């Protein structure tokens, strides 16, 4: 049974994409885009986070490129928010979180700033007159504070004044840096961003994870030595969970295939390890995380022996798994990846997609019942595009540039 690159399946993906776009519109608040609850309501107590606002700027840049009326206004709102309350006019960069009364968290987080970079780069594809200026400023901040020339890797975080950096290096922030760097490369054509993406992937995946059965280390010291026991006493941490986070493993796999495709588009021979490691990451996720306790779903975390730690099934890992399945099929032609893609869609239809309240449930327990152990509410819609739009575009250029270039469904029949 064939789904990939068929017009009939892509039409279904498009319908679901529009449903998700409509749900996300509820997140508009004066300071940016807010945290959505399970019924699409704003959770005012959560404040306005940079990472959500920047991701929604990216999302509606894609929607604008798809020709969705109203999306450009949301891009405009996102750019104004990035230049408004979230932006630190004194020290530069962006606060982690604000609300209507002022700054909630003044720290400068790499994870969040890399989404600012993604959002700004995606906005450039809409032709918004302020987008390139925002991107140039964001690049300046990234170059100055978050890219280490000495380490040739990304730093994790700073205090408000950019005077003290954290004695910690994070795989999650560096992964999203790779994602953003690829889009910056697409819109600027400056190859250093592609080179940086390759460098980061080579360290975290090819040098470390490959030698750890593709169980990706998330936490490192300042010398890039893994910290395997980090947060062992707080295993369900939203951003720094203990052990391995299989959703990140498989997400890394897709990013490496985007690098692979970007090199091919330059008529350069990609290193063989990009594809080999992408396969390894996919296989490790299936091996350790898919239904390890008898119930379907991808568990949130595992230990270093591959045993489940946090058994909740969070939404984004399986979404990323479907995007990576498509990417691997595109590169290899191996039908097993389409079979997994179909299996995972059946799971999502059965358990995750919420047609009554909108969007998808963010988290299920080990019995696939809705819960809030790790996440509360439905936050944003960013990850969902990775199973709804990625299967409709080439692997290079990246999402917003590809859609803006008219490449949506270019291979569909």
Curated annotation (Swiss-Prot):
<keyword id="KW-0413">Isomerase</keyword>
<dbReference type="InterPro" id="IPR012341">
    <property type="entry name" value="6hp_glycosidase-like_sf"/>
</dbReference>
<comment type="function">
    <text>Catalyzes the isomerization of sulfoquinovose (SQ) to 6-deoxy-6-sulfo-D-fructose (SF). Can also catalyze the interconversion of SQ and sulforhamnose (SR). Has a clear preference for beta-SQ and little-to-no activity on alpha-SQ. In vitro, can also catalyze the interconversion of mannose, fructose and glucose, or lyxose and xylulose, but has extremely low activity with glucose.</text>
</comment>
<feature type="binding site">
    <location>
        <position position="379"/>
    </location>
    <ligand>
        <name>6-sulfo-beta-D-quinovose</name>
    </ligand>
</feature>
<feature type="binding site">
    <location>
        <position position="111"/>
    </location>
    <ligand>
        <name>6-sulfo-beta-D-quinovose</name>
    </ligand>
</feature>
<protein>
    <recommendedName>
        <fullName>Sulfoquinovose isomerase</fullName>
        <ecNumber>5.3.1.31</ecNumber>
    </recommendedName>
</protein>
<dbReference type="GO" id="GO:0061720">
    <property type="term" value="P:6-sulfoquinovose(1-) catabolic process to glycerone phosphate and 3-sulfolactaldehyde"/>
</dbReference>
<feature type="binding site">
    <location>
        <position position="362"/>
    </location>
    <ligand>
        <name>6-sulfo-beta-D-quinovose</name>
    </ligand>
</feature>
<dbReference type="GO" id="GO:0050089">
    <property type="term" value="F:mannose isomerase activity"/>
</dbReference>
<feature type="binding site">
    <location>
        <position position="172"/>
    </location>
    <ligand>
        <name>6-sulfo-beta-D-quinovose</name>
    </ligand>
</feature>
<feature type="binding site">
    <location>
        <position position="251"/>
    </location>
    <ligand>
        <name>6-sulfo-beta-D-quinovose</name>
    </ligand>
</feature>
<dbReference type="GO" id="GO:0034214">
    <property type="term" value="P:protein hexamerization"/>
</dbReference>
<keyword id="KW-0119">Carbohydrate metabolism</keyword>
<dbReference type="InterPro" id="IPR008928">
    <property type="entry name" value="6-hairpin_glycosidase_sf"/>
</dbReference>
<feature type="binding site">
    <location>
        <position position="238"/>
    </location>
    <ligand>
        <name>6-sulfo-beta-D-quinovose</name>
    </ligand>
</feature>
<feature type="active site" description="Proton donor/acceptor">
    <location>
        <position position="383"/>
    </location>
</feature>
<dbReference type="InterPro" id="IPR030875">
    <property type="entry name" value="SQ_isomerase"/>
</dbReference>
<dbReference type="InterPro" id="IPR034116">
    <property type="entry name" value="AGE_dom"/>
</dbReference>
<dbReference type="GO" id="GO:0061593">
    <property type="term" value="F:sulfoquinovose isomerase activity"/>
</dbReference>
<dbReference type="GO" id="GO:0042802">
    <property type="term" value="F:identical protein binding"/>
</dbReference>
<feature type="active site" description="Proton donor/acceptor">
    <location>
        <position position="248"/>
    </location>
</feature>
<dbReference type="GO" id="GO:1902777">
    <property type="term" value="P:6-sulfoquinovose(1-) catabolic process"/>
</dbReference>
<dbReference type="GO" id="GO:0005975">
    <property type="term" value="P:carbohydrate metabolic process"/>
</dbReference>
<dbReference type="Pfam" id="PF07221">
    <property type="entry name" value="GlcNAc_2-epim"/>
</dbReference>
<feature type="binding site">
    <location>
        <position position="383"/>
    </location>
    <ligand>
        <name>6-sulfo-beta-D-quinovose</name>
    </ligand>
</feature>
<comment type="subunit">
    <text>Homohexamer.</text>
</comment>
<feature type="binding site">
    <location>
        <position position="55"/>
    </location>
    <ligand>
        <name>6-sulfo-beta-D-quinovose</name>
    </ligand>
</feature>
<dbReference type="InterPro" id="IPR010819">
    <property type="entry name" value="AGE/CE"/>
</dbReference>
<comment type="similarity">
    <text>Belongs to the N-acylglucosamine 2-epimerase family.</text>
</comment>
<feature type="binding site">
    <location>
        <position position="176"/>
    </location>
    <ligand>
        <name>6-sulfo-beta-D-quinovose</name>
    </ligand>
</feature>
């Amino acid at each position: 049974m064939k789904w990939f690159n068929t017009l009939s399946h892509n039409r279904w993906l498009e319908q679901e994409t529009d449903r998700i776009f409509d749900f996300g519109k509820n997140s508009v608040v004066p300071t940016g885009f807010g945290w959505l609850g399970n019924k699409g309501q704003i959770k005012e107590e959560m404040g306005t986070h940079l990472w959500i606002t920047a991701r929604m700027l990216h999302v509606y840049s894609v929607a604008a490129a798809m020709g969705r009326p109203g999306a450009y206004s949301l891009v405009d709102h996102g750019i104004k928010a990035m230049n408004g309350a979230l932006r630190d006019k004194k020290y530069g960069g962006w606060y982690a979180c604000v609300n209507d009364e002022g700054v909630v968290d003044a720290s400068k987080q790499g994870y969040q700033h890399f989404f600012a970079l993604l959002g700004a780069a995606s906005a450039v594809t809409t032709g918004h007159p302020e987008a390139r200026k925002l991107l140039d400023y964001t690049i300046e901040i990234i170059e100055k504070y978050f890219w280490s020339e000495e380490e040739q890797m990304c730093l994790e975080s700073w205090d408000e004044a950019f005077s003290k950096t954290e004695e910690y290096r994070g795989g999650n922030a560096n992964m999203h840096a790779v994602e953003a760097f690829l889009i910056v490369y697409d819109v600027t054509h400056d190859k250093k961003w592609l080179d940086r993406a390759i460098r980061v992937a080579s360290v975290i995946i090819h040098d470390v994870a490959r030698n750890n059965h593709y169980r990706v280390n998330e936490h490192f010291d300042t010398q890039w030595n893994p910290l395997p026991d980090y947060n062992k006493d707080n295993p369900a941490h939203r951003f720094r969970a203990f052990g391995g986070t299989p959703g990140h493993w498989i997400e890394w796999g897709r990013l490496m295939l985007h690098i692979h495709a970007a090199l091919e588009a330059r008529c350069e021979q990609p290193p063989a390890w990009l594809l080999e490691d992408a396969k390894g990451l996919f296989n490790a996720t299936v091996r350790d995380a898919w239904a390890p306790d008898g119930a379907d779903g991808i568990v949130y975390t595992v230990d270093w022996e591959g045993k489940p730690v946090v058994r909740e099934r969070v939404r984004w890992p399986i979404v990323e798994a479907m995007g990576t399945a498509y990417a691997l099929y595109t590169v290899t032609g191996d039908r097993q990846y389409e079979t997994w893609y179909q299996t995972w869609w059946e799971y999502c239809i059965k358990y995750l997609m919420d047609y009554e309240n909108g969007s998808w449930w963010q988290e299920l327990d080990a019995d696939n019942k809705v819960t809030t152990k790790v996440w509360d509410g439905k936050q944003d819609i960013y990850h969902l595009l990775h199973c709804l739009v990625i299967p409709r575009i080439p692997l290079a250029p990246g999402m917003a540039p590809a859609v803006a270039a008219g490449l949506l469904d270019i291979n569909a029949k």
